[in-house]
């Protein structure tokens, strides 16, 4: 009688032993490699990536945006590097990016097409750089943008065309720049804006500040910030808070052209409009002169005549008047 045989279960047991830890090995291999070169093909090689689409490339002294960006990226941290300029298509391939951090890079140049393809971007941080100007259309592709920080740059002027129409933008940080006023029409293209950070700028309290003050009356700043948004000129208004100015304070400022007037200028053209304006001025001056002359004539007609002088003055040359009976001419006539 043969004893029990274990030859048949052994292959099955070995197979179970080999297969049982496989999910653990797979999980370890997928999560233990932080860089793109070790198990994360959608991550730039020099960066550290974590599940959820976050790529951290902070403080690596990078001179440019690293290659290898993919559609799986949701957040890209490039702060504290040396990215001095953003060329066209700098973030090609990252069309699903929602957050982009470019703080403290010494950035001084942004190409007008640098952000093309980032239609899903919601947060853009360009603070603490060296930007002095932004080309028209720079942010035009960012239709989903909700938070934009330009704080701590060297911006002396911000044109409406640079921001473009950002219908979802809710927060705009402009503090610590060199802004004396905001260009007319800039805030009007940001219908969802409800947080505007302005402190640390040399605001000039003149007529150019009227649109900003009107916006601040509709969207009051927090008390802590309202006390720090101050005028630096003219002298009599130095250190006056912007929130203290009512619309009556700008009553001496010329009103901008209405839409109807702008439509007339556009239809006629600049040259034709100037000719028409000169003709209207000449016609108005002529009518005013005619009315003044008519008024003088009417006043003269209503004035009573002067009575005759009973004692006329003698002729200044010593000659007798023809009506004087003692004159030689009167004697000859007699």
UniProtKB/Swiss-Prot annotation:
Isoform 1 is expressed highly in normal prostate and salivary gland, very weakly in colon, pancreas, and intestine, and not at all in other tissues. Isoform 1 is expressed highly in many cancer cell lines and in breast cancer, pancreatic cancer and colon cancer. Isoform 2 is expressed in cancer cell lines. PANTHER family: SLIT AND NTRK-LIKE PROTEIN 4-RELATED, SLIT AND NTRK-LIKE PROTEIN 5. Keywords: Cell membrane, Cytoplasm, Cytoskeleton, Disulfide bond, Glycoprotein, Ion channel, Ion transport, Leucine-rich repeat, Membrane, Repeat, Signal, Transmembrane, Transmembrane helix, Transport. Auxiliary protein of the large-conductance, voltage and calcium-activated potassium channel (BK alpha). Required for the conversion of BK alpha channels from a high-voltage to a low-voltage activated channel type in non-excitable cells. These are characterized by negative membrane voltages and constant low levels of calcium. The keyword Transmembrane applies. Residues 298-334 are annotated as: Disordered. GO terms for biological process: positive regulation of voltage-gated potassium channel activity; potassium ion transmembrane transport. Glycans are attached at residue 147. It holds the Pfam family LRR_8. Interacts with KCNMA1. Residues 283-334 are cytoplasmic. Residues 34-71 form the LRRNT domain. This is Leucine-rich repeat-containing protein 26. The keyword Flavoprotein does not apply. SUPFAM superfamilies: L domain-like.
């Amino acid at each position: 009688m043969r004893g029990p045989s274990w030859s048949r279960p052994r292959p099955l047991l070995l197979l179970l032993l080999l297969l049982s830890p496989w999910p653990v090995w797979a999980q370890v291999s997928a999560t233990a490699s932080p860089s793109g070169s070790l198990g994360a093909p959608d991550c730039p090689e020099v960066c550290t990536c974590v599940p959820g689409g976050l790529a951290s490339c902070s403080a690596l002294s990078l001179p440019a945006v690293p290659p290898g960006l993919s559609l799986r990226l949701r957040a890209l941290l490039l702060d504290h590097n040396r990215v001095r300029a953003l060329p066209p298509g700098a973030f090609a391939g990252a069309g699903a990016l929602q957050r982009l951090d470019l703080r403290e890079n010494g950035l001084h140049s942004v190409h007008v097409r640098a952000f093309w393809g980032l239609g899903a971007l919601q947060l853009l941080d360009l603070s603490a750089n060296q930007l002095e100007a932004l080309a028209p259309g720079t942010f035009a592709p960012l239709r989903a943008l909700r938070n934009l920080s330009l704080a701590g740059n060297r911006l002396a002027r911000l044109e409406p065309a640079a921001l473009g129409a950002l219908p979802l933008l809710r927060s705009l940080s402009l503090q610590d720049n060199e802004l004396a006023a905001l260009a007319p029409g800039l805030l009007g293209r940001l219908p969802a804006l409800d947080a505007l950070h302005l402190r640390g700028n040399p605001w000039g309290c003149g007529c150019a500040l009227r649109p900003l003050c009107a916006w601040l009356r509709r969207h009051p700043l927090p008390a802590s910030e309202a006390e720090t948004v101050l005028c630096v000129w003219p002298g009599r208004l130095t250190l006056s808070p912007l929130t203290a100015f009512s619309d009556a304070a700008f009553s001496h400022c010329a009103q901008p052209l209405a839409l109807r007037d702008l439509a007339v200028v556009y239809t006629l053209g600049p040259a034709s409009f100037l000719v028409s304006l000169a003709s209207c001025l000449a016609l108005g001056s002529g009518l005013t002169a005619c009315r003044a002359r008519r008024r003088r004539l009417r006043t003269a007609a209503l004035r009573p005549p002067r009575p005759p002088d009973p004692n006329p003055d003698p002729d200044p040359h010593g000659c007798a008047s023809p009506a004087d009976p003692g004159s030689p001419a009167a004697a000859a006539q007699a």
